[in-house]
C-alpha cells in the first residue's frame, strides 16, 4: 500500500521556535525528535506571510502571482482546479482536514472528502451583518462540540482575548477542551473511522500558537517566570512609539510594556509546547493502529510572528520572525531511503509542499504546480534548485517585497520607497541594515534587478522594467477577484 501522508500545520510559529533549531528556551521534545530523525530545512519561507495567502500556496502549489493572493483579504472565493487534497483524493487516498482551513466559503472542501473545521476567532466569520455567516456554529465544528460540553452560552471570546492581541492569560477551561486538544481528538478518531482499504492523507491544522495567547495553565506556568530573551532590536528599528501604537492590543508595530510582552512570549512558547505534547499523543495513537512506520509527516507553519522583534508584531512583513517558518519531514519507517538527520540549507517556499507530498505518494504532479519536489534532495540525487524566493505582502503603508537567498535578503517597502539589505550569513537576526554599504552595492543592485524582473507586468505598476515604482498595492490580483 502507498504511504499514508500527514501534513501537520501550525499557525504563526516562528522558524526559530524549535529546540532543534537552536532555541535553548523552548521545550519541543516531540518535534525535536521528529526533525532530528527526519529531514530538517532551515531556510523555509512563506512568500506572502499571512494566513490566507500562505494557505493558498500550500493548497495549490502555485506562486502568489498565479494563485492571486498577495495580501490578506477575506471573502474571495477559492476556485482552484488542482489542489493537494483533490490530487490525493483522485489517486485513491482517503482525505481529511481537521482544524483551520481559512478559505471561502468556509465549508469549501477544496478537494478533501471531509473537513472538521475550526478556523479560530475570525472577525469576518463572526460579523453577524456580513456575508459570511450569522450562525458561527455552521462554520465551526469545534465551537459546536465545545458548547455540547460546556453549555450553549459558552463562546470563543469568553476569556476576553482577541485573535490578534498580544494580551495573554491561561486557558479558562479544562485542558482537554482546548482547541489544540480537539484537533488531536478528531485526528485520532479519524484513525478509527477511516477506510482501512485505502491510504490516507490527513491535514492536522492547529490554530495556535496564533493569538489568542491562551495555553492551558500548565504550559503557561512553564515559561511565565523564566528569563526569556528580550526582543531583537536592529540598528534600523524605530525606537519611537509613533502615535502610541503600542497601546493598541492588536498593533502590528509599536512599543509594548515589557511586562506584558514577557507574558505574551511565555504564552506563545507555552502554546507551542502544548502543541508538541499533543502531537506526541497522536504519534502514540498512530503507533497503536500499526501505521506509524507507513506514514510520512511534514511539519510546517503558515508564517511566523515578530513577537516584538524590532518593535514589530504579528506578521505580514518580510523580516525573519514573520517570513521564515519551521519545516521538516519525518519518515519513521525510512520509506524515502534518505540520510536521516540531515539539515538542508536550500531556500524553500510553501508551494513546495504539494509537489513534495504528491511525489512521496507516486502521484502525478499537475502542470499548474510551480513548487519543487524535495524528494530528489532527500534521496541525494542530482537536482537543481532555485537560487531565491520572491516574497511580498500588500499592507497599506507597509506594503513590501523581498528577495531572499541562502545568504542574504533585499527588502523594498513600496509605498515609502525604503530599501533594506541584510547579510544573513553574518547577521541572521537582521540587526544591521547594509543598504548604504559600498561593500555590498553590486550585490544589492543584482538583487534589485531580480525583484524588478519578478514584478514586470504586474497590475499594480511596481516597475517600468528599469526601476522600482510605488505602484498601487492590492490584496488579490484581478484574475481571481
Curated annotation (Swiss-Prot):
It comes from the Bacteria. The conversion to 3-oxoalanine (also known as C-formylglycine, FGly), of a serine or cysteine residue in prokaryotes and of a cysteine residue in eukaryotes, is critical for catalytic activity. Ca(2+) binds at residues 11-12, 51, 302-303. Its EC number is 3.1.6.1. GO terms for molecular function: arylsulfatase activity; metal ion binding. Has sulfatase activity toward para-nitrophenyl sulfate, which is increased in presence of calcium ion. This is Arylsulfatase. It comes from Clostridium perfringens (strain 13 / Type A). The lineage of its organism: Bacteria, Bacillati, Bacillota, Clostridia, Eubacteriales.
